[in-house]
Amino acid sequence: MGAVSFTSMSSSIAALTVSGYRSLRDLALPLGQLNVITGPNGCGKSNLYRSLFLLHRAADGLLARTLSEEGGMPSVLWAGARKKGPVRLQIAVSFTDGLTYHLACGLPEVNDLPSSFKLDPLIKEEKATFSERGSQSVTLLERAKSGASLRDNNGGWVHFPLALSRSESVLSQLAEPHRYPHLSALRERLRGWRFYHAFRTDEQAPLRQPQVGVFTPVLSDNGHDLAAALQTIIEAGDTEGLWRAVRQAFDGGELLITLPQDTSDGRFSVQMRLPGVLRPLHAWELSDGTLRFLCLLAALLSPRPPAVLALNEPETSLHPDLLSPLAALIVQASAQSQMWITTHSVRLSEEIQRLSGVSPITLRKTDGETRTLYHK
């Protein structure tokens, strides 16, 4: 069989399928360019978000650590009634360019060697395939308990030559990216997804204090480099879009970045000039909601937009008046990134729908199981 090729590193996700993970017994979700996930508390929105995040972390070799932060494998498996057969957590993703990736993990078996790491996942299956429209599917990676076989750059099968970590993805263990270009491209695709959930805005948060800054086209996941990220947008991104968003959100307010050459300690810091206030307010004086909105601005206006950008409950701590400007920014960002938004806010989801014409995906929980509203 000859070599195969797929060229788009930024291909969108066509569908996400999750089974055996917390409240997700068996859920298949088709996705578009802009996806807003809504539903009541406890319906499973965050579980869906986390399942996508698990694939991202698996590509970086951090699957076991990420699951351990959730309590380990026994804590994350579907706890409801099961059919007979192996207990598995399975996540699969298919892309619009014909690429698919499937990862299944489970618990240690009775005859496995004794280990103190009983909360770690054991990878049971891993598979990647590629199918161009109208052509037969080509397997790029197939892993079972006995080992893994990979498609190389000549289109031939190679048995993975190194000992595999049983709790991590093959993708994270590739040592010769030039030899396995398709799998390396898949790994970089998953690693390139971007997730934002918990910006630190407490009194001791780094973003409230001046920070040494470097060129920062991608805001960190906790927002500690906010000042540098905003200055990067000013110098190398949508400067006018940034100024406009700040003015609209804060009734004519003005964003100020104190630069190293303006200070004795050579650090960047955020300030805001607000209507009716006679002096600029420093970051340590700004509200949690104001700082969170500025973090969202930096994420959504990144000069290096990701293929997939996921925001989990972006409305947290925001004043209701900020939801319309936020919705506009999300819709604008969807022109360059596939967006995944989980939200409790009816107002935010309705405003996104008004601006984009995209209806939200509504979840519910029935007998402990997460389902979409149209699920039968």
Regions found by a protein language model. Give the residues of each.
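Conserved ABC ATPase signature
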Residues: 225, 231, 240, 247-251, ...
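N-terminal pre-Walker A segment at the start of P-loop NTPase domains
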Residues: 4-25
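Phosphate-binding P-loop
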Residues: 26-32, 301-304
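C-terminal lobe/lid and adjacent interdomain/linker elements of RecA-like ASCE P-loop ATPase modules
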Residues: 2-9, 324-376
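Conserved catalytic network of the ASCE P-loop NTPase/AAA+ motor domain
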Residues: 81-84, 299-304, 331-335, 353-355
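Phosphate-binding glycine-rich loops of NTP-binding sites
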Residues: 33-70, 222, 293-294, 347-350
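Conserved P-loop NTP-binding catalytic core
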Residues: 49-115
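Electropositive, glycine-dotted interaction segments
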Residues: 97-244
